[in-house]
Amino acid sequence: MDLLVTTNGIAEWGVRRFRCALGRSGIVVEKREGDGATPAGTLSLSRVLCRLDRIVQPDTELVLAALQPDDGWCDAPEAANYNQQVRLPHGASCEALWRVDRVYDLIVVTDFNVAPVVPHAGSAIFLHVARPGYAPTEGCIAFALDDLRLIVSEWRQADRVRVAAD
């Protein structure tokens, strides 16, 4: 089953509808590093990362790992580890995954720009927890924590996220 995400900030999954936040630049067909856009297309979910010091481990069929204080995600297009999880400190630019603001308490990693990784094509496209008021993201798709927990708990390997550009 597809989780259909559209430009109006609504995700539909079967009969369910969830509010979500998208990238500050909307949905684009050609994603570029730093453009603040959510990439259009079909995405698979590969694994779940979570802050077990803050939330109860979600029940999921996806591979699950506990986040650690030194976890990061490389966003430096010329680095060998571009668009990959890394340990901090790291020699290239990275986003810290262990955050104070709670948006990464539950992260679902997508398969965007992974096989192969293309420099400058975008990194760290996740499903994660929305900020208050569903403020725009840097390109990810963000949901209320309870909605994201539900999605993770009912996700099956054949399911996909379909991000539709108008």
Model-predicted regions and their roles:
Residues 143:
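A conserved hydrophobic position in a structured secondary element of the catalytic/binding core
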Residues 140:
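Short cysteine clusters
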Residues 1-137, 148-166:
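Cell wall/extracellular polymer interaction/catalysis modules
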